[in-house]
Amino acid sequence: MPDPSTYRPATGTIPAAPGVYKFRDPHGRVIYVGKAKSLRSRLNSYFADVTTLHPRTRQMVTTAGSVEWTVVSTEVEALQLEYNWIKEFDPRFNVRYRDDKTYPVLAVTLNEEFPRLFVYRGPRRKGVRYFGPYSHAWAIRETLDLLLRVFPARTCSSGVFKRHNQIGRPCLLGYIDKCSAPCVGRVSAEEHRQIVEDFCDFLAGRTDKLVKDLEKRMQQASEDLDFETAARLRDDIGALRKALEKQAVVLGDGTDADLVAFATDDLEAAVQVFHVRGGRVRGQRGWVVEKAGDAIDWAALDAESDLPILVEQFLTQFYGEQAALDPGAGSEAGISAVPKEVLVPVLPANATEIQAWLSKLRGSQVQLRVPQRGDKKDLAETVQRNAKEALAQHKLKRAGDFTSRSAALQGIQEALDLDSAPLRIECIDISHVQGTDVVASLVVFEDGLPRKSDYRHYAIKEAAGDGHSDDVASIAEITRRRFIRHNRDLGILAASASTMDADGGDLAPEAAIDPATGRPRRFAYPPNLFVVDGGAPQVTAAAAVLDELGVTDVAVVGLAKRLEEVWVPGEEDPVILPRTSESLYLLQRIRDEAHRFAITFHRSKRSRRMTASALDSVKGLGETRRTALVAHFGSVAKLKTATVEEIMQVPGIGETTATAVLAALGTDSAAADAGAEARALPAAVGDDELDKESESSVTSADAPSAESGSGDEGSESRELSMPTTGPSAQ
């Protein structure tokens, strides 16, 4: 455990200016970001007598291995820089108000030619407009069903849309006039987009104009004696009014505002936000965060004095992330991410700076204030009651989970005689079918919970091939690849740390950030416990690799199937954990997650191999022209017997491409026709190329990329179901 005095900046080197500071752990990972009006005063408070610090603050400073800072000219700049760093580094000791992916929203895919309306749960995407979030999915579907009478927009998936386009008949919704059937050309793309835009305007609060327009059209149809159209418009108006009844007016002055409320205890805080647009509540959102994770001495603050800090942290993180979305994606109400008015229970200490920052994000004046009387005060009290209820329910739900996870980690520590509880556990597993498509997975659990952004998968290169596989050698290969990366990244961090200025300036940018991905180096952070799926041979192989690489601070165990024995290197007998223990359950869950993730990648790799075509390797031949070739000749077998001239008869195929096609199909005539040119064409991309290692990672909207570099579908945060493991994969 580092001693704070070992990295304390020299006396007089910390400036007495406003700025933002970062604490890093010995591995270079940023663990806390904060800002201060006076860096000298704030940082010196961290290096006081450690025994006088609050336990949570003490844990942060003793975990850290270095501190850095950046001086800024104004507090608004400090506010922006602090938000950017928290978003970039995801420090473990900072409070994070993450989107609750379980809240359903109504999504409108404006980035498609024919926009689609559907219920969605997951991270926000650019080019998609969102309305909500709603507390229940059925509420969205009920409202959508009502509005489709008036706005018959597309709701089907891309696959259904293409299928009905091919068969030339609309779906059931098209026959009952709840879809304008753009799939069969009943309306043009422009007409359908206008329907969708009217739908968005209605949900965004611009309802009066739509209702008045419909009433005028109904009156005109009646005067023209078109009573059928008038009756349909009358029903449409009734449907709109029924939908409006579900969003009662709560603020009669047509206010656009967000009302924020908090409920706290000594360890946690719940926050609720009501989004009011046009005087109506358009959405509700809630979070619960652990105050224990922040380096602020919460226990020294009373319930009233900690609220300004919570308000400041929430406003900077929430509106910073909302404004960072593509403006075309929209916010919850389908309009500006920052409303004209933000109502909070108390004003933060730097309310003027935050209000200026919010106004900059919006592009116009934003008011930040506390409601004092009237309807806004009453609604704020309702939001406050919701926050208290959310905190109470959360504590009941999480009490058992937190207790069991703590007991599991402590039980593993005692059973394996570890120096400390294994807060970070990594597990690897191998998957293949009779030695083909051999792959491996690496999953990461922190504090007993999966950290899917750190998941990786691998294609076995040396220990498998030609229909054979050696599980023990595969375990050794993956262990070596993982910890070679660890040593390499750790070496980069150590080398970069030596470049730190004597005055405590920032580390070189390449220290903690991977230049290839722009993200923190994940492999420089080692596990406390490394679990392999297998018994004594597998764990011995992994331990031998760690010894070879000089990794001495990582414990290794193997979890054997069937008897669920825990094997420790160098021990003749396994450790037997009680069948009902939380420790064994956690290890099983980690092992099963690694197994599931490996099988997911194996099936993907096997599917690509089984559906691959020789035409896939032809340079410049895309999917459209491949389809045209097969459609023209009827099959690949007939294509093989064709000549260059016959292939050139297919639209879009020239002589060079035709020659390359015959060369890829391996026909005898190809060599004569192509000569040296065909031999110079690139060969088909093989598994080795497909599985080339990549260190790239992706955002919260996408899944992290794999060590093998071929995509990481299984680790996406939006993944809601576990794939079923079949008997064919092991």
Swiss-Prot record:
Pfam families: GIY-YIG, HHH_5, UVR, UvrC_RNaseH, UvrC_RNaseH_dom
Keyword Disulfide bond attributed: no
Entry-linked Gene3D superfamilies: 5' to 3' exonuclease, C-terminal subdomain, GIY-YIG endonuclease, UVR domain, UvrC, RNAse H endonuclease domain
Superkingdom field: Bacteria
UniProt cross-references to PROSITE patterns, sorted A to Z: GIY_YIG, UVR, UVRC
Keywords attached to this entry: Cytoplasm, DNA damage, DNA excision, DNA repair, Excision nuclease, SOS response
SUPFAM superfamilies cross-referenced by the UniProt entry: C-terminal UvrC-binding domain of UvrB, GIY-YIG endonuclease, RuvA domain 2-like
Major location (coarse): cytoplasm
Extent of the signal sequence: none
Domain GIY-YIG: 16-95
Residue ranges the record marks as coiled coil: none
Region (Disordered): 678-730
Primary role: The UvrABC repair system catalyzes the recognition and processing of DNA lesions. UvrC both incises the 5' and 3' sides of the lesion. The N-terminal half is responsible for the 3' incision and the C-terminal half is responsible for the 5' incision.
Subunit record text: Interacts with UvrB in an incision complex.
Name of this protein: UvrABC system protein C
Taxonomic source organism: Rhodococcus erythropolis (strain PR4 / NBRC 100887)
Lineage: Bacteria, Bacillati, Actinomycetota, Actinomycetes, Mycobacteriales
Gene this protein is translated from: uvrC
